[in-house]
């Protein structure tokens, strides 16, 4: 069963067929980046985990 979501990071909109693929991508970003980039990835990751269907980095 798919759970599509949309992420908006650095102004770029990306459609994901599966929420958990997006979670994995942004989790990796949180673990490997620092500073403002890490904060952006964290914002999106938390929104994904909260069940939102459109998640931005702001």
Sequence positions of predicted segments:
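TPR/TPR-like alpha-solenoid repeats
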Residues: 48, 52-55
């Amino acid at each position: 069963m798919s759970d599509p979501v949309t992420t908006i990071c650095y102004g770029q909109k990306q459609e994901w067929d599966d929420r958990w693929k997006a979670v994995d991508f942004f989790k990796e970003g949180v673990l490997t980046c620092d500073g403002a980039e890490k904060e952006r990835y964290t914002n999106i990751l938390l929104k994904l985990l909260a069940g939102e269907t459109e998640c931005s980095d702001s």
